[in-house]
């Protein structure tokens, strides 16, 4: 779903949770609703976009109520990060920080976190989305310039990627061989095969 073409101009009409690691958001443009279901369990964090959603009458809690009926002004991604920001007309925003077991949704007021979906991640109250924006050079030159610091430089690659590289002989490889392995992994990530 192309959120930047869908959500601007819509109002947030409900934000609630029925499960510990799940947030449902409903946006409406006066004609139809658009739903975002944010699932944040550590084993698989993802966003899905159901066509409709029936809210349970029990075990449901309203969240981010200060944003209700506020109009969306923009949707943006943070460069080289697994994050999405939904901006509202009143200088507030919802930041979807999709970082594996550290995933969270933060209510921002003037770029500063003021409320959290996963309250136990209190360090998120000190974070700013601009600190996560970065330009990463994926070229061979960038790779060689960051020799020995690859895990810190290529922050968007998580543990399974580095584990795969290790299984393919990363530790024993020289820099040229590592570059070939790295390039191969990038190709796999950009053109994935998956089965349902």
Question: Which positions does each model-derived feature cover?
Answer:
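Flexible, charged surface loops at secondary-structure boundaries
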Residues: 6-8, 18, 66-69
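Non-catalytic, usually N-terminal nucleic-acid engagement modules in DNA/RNA processing proteins
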Residues: 24
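Short beta-strand
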Residues: 14-17, 76-77
């Amino acid at each position: 779903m192309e959120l930047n073409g869908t959500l601007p101009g819509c109002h947030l009409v409900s934000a609630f949770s029925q499960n510990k690691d799940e947030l449902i958001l409903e946006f409406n443009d006066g004609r139809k609703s658009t739903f975002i279901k944010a699932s944040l369990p550590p084993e698989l964090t993802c966003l899905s976009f159901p066509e409709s959603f029936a809210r349970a009458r029990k075990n449901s809690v309203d969240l981010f109520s200060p944003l209700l009926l506020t109009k969306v002004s923009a949707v943006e991604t943070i460069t080289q990060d697994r994050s999405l920001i939904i901006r509202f007309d009143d200088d507030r925003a919802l930041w979807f920080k999709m970082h594996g077991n550290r995933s969270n949704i933060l209510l921002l007021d003037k770029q500063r976190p003021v409320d959290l979906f996963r309250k136990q991640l209190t360090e998120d109250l000190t974070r700013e989305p601009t600190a996560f924006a970065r330009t990463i050079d994926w070229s061979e030159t960038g790779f060689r310039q960051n020799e020995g610091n690859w895990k810190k430089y290529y922050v968007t690659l998580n543990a399974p990627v580095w584990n795969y590289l290790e299984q393919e002989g990363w530790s024993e490889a020289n820099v040229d061989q590592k570059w070939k392995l790295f390039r191969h992994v990038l190709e796999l990530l950009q053109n994935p095969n998956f089965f349902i």
